[in-house]
């Protein structure tokens, strides 16, 4: 059983300075003040309520005890650090954001990119994933962006971070816009961030396949309520520990590699402020 360390004084300092205490050894669970911190409140309630995206392929599927995926492991990592159970609830990006804002969820993993605009509405952790806009080919003749000429394409891109097909290949054929790529009609290719595209792929299949160059870079982090930045910072420390101790790479191997065939790359080292600065507020 993990050992608990009573840190009432540390919690007072935490509230006053908005600093996260040092990450303890793996066999230690810090006991936080339930009045001063969300970490302590979660410990008092005995459960961390985590929102995960619906049908997100290797990133999240199912809910409750049936939840599986990369973000599910991240949620378990945070719950384990607090010594509590975890309750996974699935929803659309909009539903997850609303549940965070209402206090129904403590933490959520909506597929919402980190931008300077986004961090004015919610607190985010450092990125657990750096996505790239890519082309997902269903047609062996589509091997790069230039090959989209005359092809039918479905795109799912963010208004701020995405680059539309019309700019990438002005000669593309019919282009359909879909918030959910699963709702796309039959097409030759899809365009969007890889964090969304991977849900359309299956282990072992030659097609569809990610092709061509990476178009951009976008950070994705876990979300908390805007006023709960201290908790978001605490969660970032748990993600950092998972990266340095090899668990991030292990989860990549368990969930992402079977779909893409890629070996685990270096974990993301980008901080929240760096990710947001890639997409500044309009002046």
Residue ranges, per PLM feature:
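Short loop->beta-strand "edge-of-pocket" segments that line small-molecule binding or catalytic clefts
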Residues: 48-52, 145-163
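Extracytoplasmic small-molecule ligand-binding "clamshell" domains
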Residues: 27-111
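Flexible hinge/capping segments at coil-to-helix
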Residues: 126, 137-153, 233
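Short helix-initiation/N-cap motifs at beta->coil->alpha
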Residues: 35, 87-98, 140, 170-186, ...
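C-terminal motif of bacterial Sec signal peptides marking the signal peptidase cleavage site
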Residues: 13-18
């Amino acid at each position: 059983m993990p050992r608990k360390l009573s840190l009432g004084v540390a919690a007072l300092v935490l509230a006053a300075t908005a600093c996260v205490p040092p990450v303890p050894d793996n066999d230690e669970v810090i006991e936080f003040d339930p009045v001063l911190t969300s970490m302590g409140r979660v410990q008092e309630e005995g459960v961390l309520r985590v929102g995960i995206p619906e049908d997100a392929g290797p990133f999240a599927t199912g809910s409750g005890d049936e939840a599986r995926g990369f973000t599910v492991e991240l949620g378990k990592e945070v719950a384990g650090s607090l010594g509590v159970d975890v309750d996974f609830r699935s929803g659309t990006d909009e539903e997850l954001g609303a549940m965070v804002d209402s206090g129904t969820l403590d933490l959520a993993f909506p597929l919402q990119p980190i931008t300077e605009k986004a961090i004015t509405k919610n607190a985010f952790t450092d990125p657990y994933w750096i996505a790239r806009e890519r082309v997902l080919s269903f047609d062996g003749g589509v091997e790069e962006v230039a090959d989209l000429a005359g092809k039918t394409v479905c795109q799912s891109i963010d208004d701020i971070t995405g680059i539309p097909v019309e700019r990438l290949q002005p000669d593309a054929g019919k282009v359909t816009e879909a918030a959910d790529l699963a709702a796309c009609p039959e097409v030759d290719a899809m365009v969007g961030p890889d964090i969304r595209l991977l849900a359309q792929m299956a282990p072992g299949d030659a097609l569809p396949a990610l092709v061509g160059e990476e178009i951009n870079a976008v950070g994705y982090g876990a979300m908390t309520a805007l006023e709960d930045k201290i908790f978001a910072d605490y969660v970032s420390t748990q993600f950092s520990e998972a990266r340095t101790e090899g668990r991030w790479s292990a989860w990549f191997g368990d969930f992402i590699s079977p779909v893409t065939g890629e070996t685990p790359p270096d974990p993301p080292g980008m901080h929240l402020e760096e990710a947001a600065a890639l997409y500044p507020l309009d002046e």
